[in-house]
Amino acid sequence: MITYSYDGKYILTANEGEPATDYLADPLGTVSIISVKDNYTVTTLDFSGFASQQTALQAKGLRVFGPNASFATNMEPEYITISPDSRTAWVTLQENNAIAKIDIRSKSVTHIFPLGFKDYNLNGNAIDPSDKDNTILQKKVKVKGMYQPDAIAMLEQWGKPLLFTANEGDVREWSAFAENKRIKDLALDPTVFPDAATLKLDENLGRLNVTSTLGNPDNDADYDQLYSFGARSFSVWNGLNGQLVYDSKNELETKTKAIAAGVYDDGRSDDKGVEPEGITLGYVGKRMIAFVGMERADLVAIYDVSDPYHPAFIKTLVTGDAPEGLLFIPAKYSPTNKSLLVVSSENDGTVKVYQTN
């Protein structure tokens, strides 16, 4: 991703640094800060300074994994958001299940916030884990979701930076290494999963893709915990400490199923569900609105986030095939004098512009 600071002094790029498919090359994941006023001088930041904290960060949910995994090459920056005062940037590390905080003026990475995991066995978090059950059936399951946010947007509210993330999820799947496994292909701990044979049926958990890199802390022959990709939600995080402020739980999929009949793609239930991918914020009148693009549902969910601790669902908007990028244009910059939402959809190659009322 490439973006710029509000004061126009800096351009920032997220340089993901994905490995070659054979892992013979795995470049550093970095963020570049380009100083416009200094003749476009480039300062590139990596994450090697946090290598000594790897164990502590992993205990909180950071992921470092893969062939010959080193901390700095493992970090994969994805999307960036910048504070209105142009002093701070936050970067999603999607595969690593974390957000990094950057001081723009000192050109340094100051924090990495691991995001932890979402428990699908709690009320309100139920998911449909199967694409072979001939229905859309949400149920509580003994699985945890890795948030793994893709897009990120920032809102300053009551003097506090709040980070909105679209928790799409992502898989490392290359010719030399693939982390994803279906639950039916894993050995499950008989004490934790006494009903493993039933759980492994295709219509239950058998088809659900999970990571093989987590869930076996004792390194024996079976898995004690299961972790799937993404959280099928959008979340709000405290930008100062990375603490979770709000999560939409399973509301995106519940609303998709209830309001947009025939839109929910049950064929994606075994992967990442509706795959919230894009998110943008903006004032419509006096209300702060969040727009959440769901790639696999071909929808944008619209929320009133004037109180970001208690977002309120408004409606879903049917878009093109696989909405990818979302851009909000405030009314004062709009040629129609009304706020606009621009949605780019990757599968049908369209860009659509919606005018708010």
Regions found by a protein language model. Give the residues of each.
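Beta-sheet-rich non-transmembrane sensory/scaffold domains
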Residues: 1-357
